[in-house]
Amino acid sequence: MKVAILESIVMPAGHEVEFDRILIEGLKTQGYDPLFFVPEKFPFKFDYKTEVEYLAGGEVVSYAGAGKLEKIWRSFLREKRRIAWFNDAYKKAVQGKCDVIIVPTATYRYLRTLGNSYLKESPVPVIFVFHGINPDEKQKFIKFAKKCEAYPNIKLKIITLRDDFKADKLTNVDLIDPPVFRPWDLNKIKPVEKHQPLKLGFFGQYRREKNLGFFLDAFIQARFTVPVKLIVQGATAKPEDSAAFEKYMKEYSDYEEIEFWHRNLIGKEWHEALLSVDAIIMPYAAERYRYHWSAMLFTAIGFNKPLLQSPEINPEVLQKFVIGEALDMTSKGAFVRQLEHFVNKFSKNIPIYNEALGKANVLYSQENLIKNIMD
């Protein structure tokens, strides 16, 4: 069975790249024949070693560097091209070039586009994968999801740990668990162990909402009983985020125990960076993290890394598995004490972390993701 991944998102950080890799490799493992449907001149960040079909309609439209008026124009152009891509995907399905189409990172806007394209009448199943629905977008999602009920081959899958749609009785929506992100070389996955210095990692796409200054101040105030090294990596998409990250690099340049990496980490370099630390810190403060599954959290699980995270990040996981702690963000003093406790008790808690991470990896396996999408 040929399964087409209709991808049109280009991002600087690694999780979109990694999610597509999970799909491609997972589909192959379970006996499917995956391929990509992508816009013309699509800039792949990774060689997935799989077939590629290009979609007519123009190249991907980026908002990078666009002012207010320019962004409005690009938004219009993006929608126009998305309709064209969907129409061409429909043609390819009619021609028998695939048996299933998966749109791996959808929003309600994709369903609006679908309604204006031929793809809604697809002769093969078209599976839209959503990575969470914010409350302020829920009604828009429901509106377009209900319209899709008229088209039996349109399937909607929401990756979530919540159940916010029980009362809405949508017949075409399934809620599925998130997958862990794992190293390419599974032999490199090690149990949690004691190392000196204990390395803490702050990774991912940096946005100013991620409380980095609050965390750095707490880190330099904390008194640890073991040597500690902090790695702070930031991939930045917007100029204002890049400037903020550079500012932190200058402010904390005198602290030898803090190492900054202002660059994207893709593929092997990303995996090696994650494997090099003992624990992952996620002091991200934004309410939307309750509704969208955290790729960084599920990377930590897949790489067997205990974590310290803000309470907004998928709290359902820590309620099930003792793989770390939810941070007390009420004051810097409370944060400092918790950071000290986490680091100073880390060695003692290693057996607990290993058992919980093992169970979490089973529940949130990549194999389960593929089964849930294709079911």
Where are these regions (language model features)?
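Glycosyltransferase donor-sugar binding loop
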Residues: K229-F245, R263
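N-terminal strand-loop element at the rim of the active site
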Residues: T29-R78, Y108, A235-D241
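Conserved donor-binding/catalytic core segment of Leloir-type glycosyltransferases
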Residues: P191-K210, L216-R223, L230-I231
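Nucleotide-activated donor-dependent transferases that construct or modify glycoconjugates
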Residues: M1-G14, T105-A106, G201-F202, I281
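Nucleotide-sugar-dependent
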Residues: M282-F298, S310-E312, E316-V317
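A charged, aromatic-enriched C-terminal amphipathic alpha-helix characteristic of glycosyltransferases
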Residues: G14-H15, M329-D375
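A short, glycine/small-residue-rich beta-strand->loop->alpha-helix junction that serves as a flexible
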Residues: E7-R21, F44, R207-K210
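Nucleotide-activated donor-binding/catalytic signature segment of Leloir-type glycosyltransferases, i.e.
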Residues: A243-H271
